[in-house]
């Protein structure tokens, strides 16, 4: 919004040229989202408390968590407000990637809000049924996947629908340009062509998978938000590189016109996340709930797809991956042993993984900070793929 205003008034005031610089707008988006979160945080927490949207704690979880029962949840709305205002103020609103990321983020946020609402109203820690939640995630994920298959391929925003129709007329067999290939980290001249169907399937699983992985990780005070900020910031760097014809050429990456604007979104997400951490750090005054976790995970997955860094997201989001795998392995092993031996057995003391470490003697703050450190190391490793190719 401010970019369009600055471009309109630039002839009358040359200092407004500053607003056209992507890096300046990214910094301002961070400050704006951070300021909104810090200022509005107490009001949001107070309103959530008045609405009696207290967290229902699992009775089969660690006993130390029982004291958290009643802590306001659905605090993810504070993050989404900061992201929305900062992105709309400082982003280029003609950019197609900004809008698709916002659509996925807030679409998944609505799903999470409904899930949280059911948990609060019916006092059921499980919320929406897995089938219902997965259905709506799939609707949004598939829509985004189909759109991105052609918008990433098209250098300009004017022929996306034409490209889609050309694919239909080709009998759904048309390929995609090299910029839509799956990039392999550390290999500068090798990529895997996906085709339209491959792109759609991969994108769907990345977006939906990232959303659920972040949601599973959200189980301790401050645990998930810092990894989201770190991974989001790292993806913002990739977006800046991919969106620049100069840097992408120098670093031997495909140039994706318009992708650089995602730096604004990632910066807003970082600022909003840090503001939320102010109130979510141990002992938490508010929990983000599914409204925040599902939205942020979907956002990370969508940005990673646009900048063609799905594998790097897998690396940098290693904590999210480990948490998800711990649940999958725990459930699978329990079902297998119950069928084989007549009683279910567990691989871990409890899943997700952070609860296993809690029950192994780690304090909650130890688990959180150590997971942060691991994520920082993984993000630095992921960023190294920019040059080590």
From Swiss-Prot:
Pathway: Cell wall biogenesis; peptidoglycan biosynthesis. Its cofactor is Mg(2+). It is an enzyme of class 2 (transferase). Its EC number is 2.7.8.13. Keywords: Cell cycle, Cell division, Cell inner membrane, Cell membrane, Cell shape, Cell wall biogenesis/degradation, Magnesium, Membrane, Metal-binding, Peptidoglycan synthesis, Transferase, Transmembrane, Transmembrane helix. It catalyses: UDP-N-acetyl-alpha-D-muramoyl-L-alanyl-gamma-D-glutamyl-meso-2,6-diaminopimeloyl-D-alanyl-D-alanine + di-trans,octa-cis-undecaprenyl phosphate = di-trans,octa-cis-undecaprenyl diphospho-N-acetyl-alpha-D-muramoyl-L-alanyl-D-glutamyl-meso-2,6-diaminopimeloyl-D-alanyl-D-alanine + UMP. It is a multi-pass membrane protein. It is found in: Cell inner membrane. PROSITE patterns: MRAY_1, MRAY_2. NCBIfam families: mraY. Belongs to the glycosyltransferase 4 family. MraY subfamily. HAMAP family: MraY (MF_00038). This is Phospho-N-acetylmuramoyl-pentapeptide-transferase. The gene is mraY.
């Amino acid at each position: 919004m401010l970019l369009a205003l600055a471009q309109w008034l630039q002839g009358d005031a040359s200092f407004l040229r500053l607003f056209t610089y992507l890096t300046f707008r990214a910094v301002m988006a961070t400050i704006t989202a951070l300021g909104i979160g810090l200022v509005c945080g107490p009001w949001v927490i107070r309103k959530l408390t008045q609405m009696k949207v207290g967290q229902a704690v699992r009775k089969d979880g660690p006993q130390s968590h029982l004291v958290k029962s009643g802590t306001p949840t659905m605090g993810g709305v504070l993050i989404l407000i900061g992201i929305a205002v900062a992105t709309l103020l400082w982003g280029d609103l003609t950019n197609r990637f900004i809008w698709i990321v916002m659509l996925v983020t807030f679409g998944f946020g609505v799903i999470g809000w409904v899930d949280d609402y059911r948990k609060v109203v019916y006092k059921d820690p499980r919320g929406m049924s897995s089938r219902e939640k997965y259905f709506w995630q799939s609707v949004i994920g598939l829509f985004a996947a189909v759109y991105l298959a052609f918008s990433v391929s098209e250098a300009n925003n004017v022929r996306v629908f034409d490209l889609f129709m050309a694919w239909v007329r080709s009998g759904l067999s048309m390929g995609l340009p090299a910029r839509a290939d799956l990039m392999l980290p550390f290999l500068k001249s090798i990529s895997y062509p996906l085709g339209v169907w491959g792109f759609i399937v991969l994108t769907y699983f990345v977006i939906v998978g990232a959303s659920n992985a972040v949601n599973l990780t959200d189980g301790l005070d401050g645990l998930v938000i810092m990894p989201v900020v770190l991974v989001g910031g790292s993806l913002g760097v990739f977006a800046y590189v991919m969106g620049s014809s100069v840097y992408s050429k120098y670093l031997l990456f495909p140039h994706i016109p318009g992708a650089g604007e995602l730096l604004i979104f990632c910066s807003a997400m970082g600022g909003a996340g840090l503001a939320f951490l102010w109130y979510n750090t141990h002992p938490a005054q508010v929990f983000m709930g599914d409204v925040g976790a599902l939205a942020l995970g979907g956002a990370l997955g969508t940005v990673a797809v646009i900048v063609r860094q799905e594998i790097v997201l897998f690396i940098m989001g290693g904590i999210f991956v480990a948490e998800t795998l711990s649940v999958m392995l725990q459930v699978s092993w329990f079902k297998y042993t119950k069928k084989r031996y007549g009683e279910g057995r567990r691989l871990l003391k409890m899943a997700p993984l952070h609860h296993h470490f809690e029950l192994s003697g780690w304090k909650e703050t130890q688990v959180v900070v150590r997971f942060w450190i691991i994520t920082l190391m993984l993000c630095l490793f992921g960023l190294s793929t920019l040059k080590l190719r």
